[in-house]
Amino acid sequence: MASVKRNFLFNILLVTSNIVFPVLVFPYIARILGPQGLGNAHFALQFSKYFVTTASLGIPIYGLREVAKVKNHKAKLSKLVSELLLLNIITAFLSFGVYAIVLYSSGTLAQNFDLFAIASLQVLLGFLAIDWLFAGLEDFKIITVRSLTIRLITVLFLLFFVKTKNDVFPYLLISILSILLGHLWNLFYATTKVKFSFKNLNISAHLKPIFIIFLMNLCIAMYTIFDTVWVGFLSTATAVGMYISAVKLSKIGIPIVSALGTVLLPRSARTFAANINNPIHLQTSFNFIVDLAVPIGVGMFLLAPELLFVFSGAAFSDALIAMRLLSFLPLFIGLSNLFGMQILSASGNDKLVLKSVFIGMLINVVLNVILVPKFAHNGAALAIVITEGIVTLVTFYFAFKKFAIRFNTKRFARDFAACVTFLPLIWLFKTYLTSPSLIIVGSLTACAIIYLSLQHFWFKNEFVNQAIVTVKKKLNK
C-alpha cells in the first residue's frame, strides 16, 4: 500500500504538471499563432501521431502488463523488453515508410510539407517511447522527474523562439524535439533497469497477444487522434484550431481523473493473474473518477466562455459550443479506462475491449463524415462525445457480464446534487465581476469549498476524510 501511495503522489505531481504546462503555454501559443497557425501545427502533430500509434502495435498496454508480471525476474524482464523494443523498431521503420508515401501523394498534406516532414521524426523514433517499462515496474518517479524537466526546458524554448504568427515551424519543431528528448531520457535510464540484448530473441511469441491490442489501439486512435485529422481534411485549418482549443481545455481534467487508475493498472494485472475477479481497488477507482469528473465537467460547462477567452483569446470564441459539448469528456474517458483497461485488458480480455472500441470507431467515422463537413469543429466535438459515451457503456456491459462487478452508481446522483450549488455561485460571480480571470478564480475557489464541504460533512466522502486526517497528522507533528 505504501508503494501505491508513493506512486500516486508522484503521479499527482505529474498530473499537476500536465495541467500547469498547458495553462502556462497554450494561452501564449494560441494568441501568437492564432486559429489557423495553431490548426496547421496540430494537424501535422495529430496526423503523425496516428502513425506512431500504428507502429506501437499496442506495446504500451501489452508491455506494461507483461512487465508487471516479471518485474522481479531481471533476466526475464531484460529478454521481454529487448524483444518488444526490437519489434517496435521494425514497425516504426515500416510506419515511417507508409507515412512518407502518403505525404508525397497527398495534395492536402503537400500544402504544409515542411510541417508534416518535421512531424515525421516522431514516427521514425517513436519506438524509443518506453514509458510502459517504468509504469510496469511501478517506477513513476522517473516518469515524473523526466516530464517536469523537459517541460520546463520546452516552456523556455517556446517563449524564446515563438514570437509571431509566422513561427508555426519553430513551435512544431520544439514540440517534436521535446518528445524525442523524453524518449532518449527513457532509453538512457532503462539501461539501469534492464540489460538490452538482441541475441536469442523470440519476438514472434508476442505477435498473437499484441495483434488484438494493436487492432484495439487503431480503433481508439481513429476517434482520439484522428478526430483532429478529420477536421483537417473535411474542413479548414481554422476549424482545426477551434477544435484543438476546445479539446485542450476539456482534456485538462483527464490526467487528474486517470491518476489513480494509472497507478493501479499494474496491480490490476497481477490481481487478475492471481484469479481474484473482484478487486476492492476497482470500486475505489470508480469512486475517485466520479467524484472528480462530475464537478470538473459541470464547472467547465458553466465557465466555458471565460475559460476560452482567458486560455485561447477572443479569436477562439467560435469554439464555445465545442467546448461545452466536450466538457464531460473526462467522465466518459475515465470510466471507459476503468472498465476497459483496469478490468477487461488487465484480466486478459482484450478481445472484448476490441469489440467495444471497434463499435466506437464505426460510429465515430460515420458521425464525422456526416457532421464535420456541415458543422466543422462542432460536428467533430459532438461525434467524439457520442463515441466515448457509447464505448463507456459497452465496456461496462462486458465488464459486468464477465465478472459481475458492481459499482455504487448512486455516486453519480450524489455528486451531481453537490454540483447544483455551482449554478447560483457562478451566476453571482458573472453578474458582479467583469474580468473573466477573476470570474474563473472566484468561481473555482467558491465551488471547490462548497463541493468539498458537502462531500465531507454531508456525504462523508472517504477521499476527503482521509485527506483531512492526513493533513491533521502532518500539522500535529
At which residue positions do the language-model features occur?
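Signature of the first transmembrane helix
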Residues: 3-61, 96, 100, 155, ...
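Interhelical loop/hinge segments that connect adjacent transmembrane helices in multipass membrane
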Residues: 144, 168-175, 184-224, 263, ...
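Membrane-interface junctions at transmembrane-helix termini in multi-pass inner-membrane proteins
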Residues: 113, 123-147, 328-359
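Hydrophobic alpha-helical transmembrane segments
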Residues: 120, 144-192, 358-363, 377-398, ...
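N-terminal membrane topogenesis motif
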Residues: 1-23, 75-78, 191, 200-216, ...
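Membrane-proximal transmembrane or re-entrant/amphipathic helices at the cytosolic face
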Residues: 427-477
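Helix-loop junctions and terminal segments of transmembrane helices
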Residues: 27, 56-72, 250-293, 340-346
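Interfacial segments at transmembrane-helix termini and the short loops linking adjacent helices
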Residues: 102-119, 300-335
